Amino acid sequence: MIPARVVAGLALALGLLSGSAVSADDLMPMDTSGVDPDMLKSMYGPWVIADESGGKRCNVVLTDEPTIGGSVIHVDPACEKTFPVMADIAAWRLMTNWGIDLADAERKTRIRFTTPDNAYVAEPETDGIFTILQPEE
């Protein structure tokens, strides 16, 4: 029989060997209680969802108004013609590491945007959606 402390030590060692980087699958809803309010405000407002070329675009508005499954998202009615999955989007969530989840009415994440570099990238790329960005002023 293997002592519990050996099993715990092996589990810890394996966890350390597997890397400490947080993957997109590990993201959790962000605890915004300690976040600078101005940083949070910068997340709210108009955004553009686009394909990789930027030729296909869809306008959304992310709000701070709570709803079932996250916060209210206003999706331009024309979006579902450009990106059919947008017809199912009912909420958005701010995730750790400033990720953005778009969720359906059953609270299932349909698209997750993360920032591996300096721009948001969709995971998975659905209906050609590649990124979400704030419109240039």
Residue ranges and their predicted role:
Residues 9-18:
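Bacterial N-terminal signal peptides
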Residues 20-24:
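Sec/Tat signal peptide C-region and signal peptidase I cleavage site
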